[in-house]
């Protein structure tokens, strides 16, 4: 059973010029840090995304910030850590993480996640797996009313070895994917997106996902797949910034 907690106590003292959604995202991030940051933490994972910017901001305000290191999940989060004046570490140096904070593209009612819209899914999952507690911060648009694949309609992000993209694409179609696309760089880059690990990304649309654990396992068995953006039963809590300006927390 999920516990739902509504709070508006972090809304006060914010710039009136900010949009209500941005205020709520900031409130969610601040509340997530304040309620979950472990006393005596030595290693903290910091993810990426627009809401995690506020997580880094709040962590930088802690009086004991010199006593712990922050491990990034990719280039963007590395820059967040540096810009916030926090001590930077790596997952190679610190394979055990006390707590990790990250965003999500979608969260279902069982706290399963779709991540990878920002192309950092492998390192995000590595840090999440290393963490004793994994806390998600997002806005209300990322919350599914039931299953994954309802709010996030771009498909499951899948990181693959570049030379395997054609074979993996065919295999995903055979598994029932309605649409399979090799993610492109768009106007910023000609050709496919290249991850921080020098891999490609495929987005595979399976519609509403009935069993994310099985789908993750089936995809991982395909030769050439590095990791999927399905984070199954990894999150400890999720904080949502609501359109109303309140914060809603889902926990196990």
Swiss-Prot record:
Keywords: Cytoplasm, Isomerase. The keyword Phosphoprotein does not apply. The keyword Isomerase applies. It is an enzyme of class 5 (isomerase). Its EC number is 5.3.1.6. Its main location: cytoplasm. One of its GO terms (molecular function) is ribose-5-phosphate isomerase activity. SUPFAM superfamilies: D-ribose-5-phosphate isomerase (RpiA), lid domain, NagB/RpiA/CoA transferase-like. Pathway: Carbohydrate degradation; pentose phosphate pathway; D-ribose 5-phosphate from D-ribulose 5-phosphate (non-oxidative stage): step 1/1. It catalyses: aldehydo-D-ribose 5-phosphate = D-ribulose 5-phosphate. GO terms for biological process: D-ribose metabolic process; pentose-phosphate shunt, non-oxidative branch; pyridoxine biosynthetic process. It is found in: Cytoplasm. GO terms for cellular component: cytoplasm. Belongs to the ribose 5-phosphate isomerase family. NCBIfam families: PRK00702.1, rpiA. PANTHER family: RIBOSE-5-PHOSPHATE ISOMERASE (PTHR11934:SF0). This is Ribose-5-phosphate isomerase.
């Amino acid at each position: 059973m999920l516990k739902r907690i509504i709070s508006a106590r972090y809304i006060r003292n914010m710039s009136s010029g900010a949009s209500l959604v941005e205020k709520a995202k900031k409130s969610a991030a601040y509340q997530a840090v304040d309620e979950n940051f472990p006393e005596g933490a030595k290693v903290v994972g910091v993810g990426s995304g627009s809401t995690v910017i506020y997580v880094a901001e709040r962590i930088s305000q802690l009086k004991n910030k010199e006593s712990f290191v922050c491990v990034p999940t990719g280039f963007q989060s590395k820059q967040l850590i540096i810009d916030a004046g926090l001590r930077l570490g790596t997952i190679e140096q610190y394979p055990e993480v006390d707590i990790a904070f990250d965003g999500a593209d979608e969260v279902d009612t069982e706290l399963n996640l779709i991540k990878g819209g920002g192309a950092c899914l492998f390192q995000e999952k590595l840090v999440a797996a290393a963490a004793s507690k994994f806390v998600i911060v997002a806005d209300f648009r990322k919350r599914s009313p039931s299953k994954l694949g309802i709010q996030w309609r771009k498909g499951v992000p899948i990181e693959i070895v570049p030379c395997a993209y054609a074979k993996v694409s065919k295999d995903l179609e055979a598994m029932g994917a309605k649409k399979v696309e090799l993610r492109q760089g768009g106007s910023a880059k000609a050709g496919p997106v290249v991850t921080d690990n020098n891999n490609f990304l495929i987005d595979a649309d399976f519609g509403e996902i009935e069993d994310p654990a099985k789908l993750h396992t089936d995809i991982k068995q395909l030769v050439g797949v590095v990791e999927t953006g399905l984070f199954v039963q990894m999150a400890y809590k999720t904080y949502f910034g609501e359109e109303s300006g309140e914060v809603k927390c889902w926990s196990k």
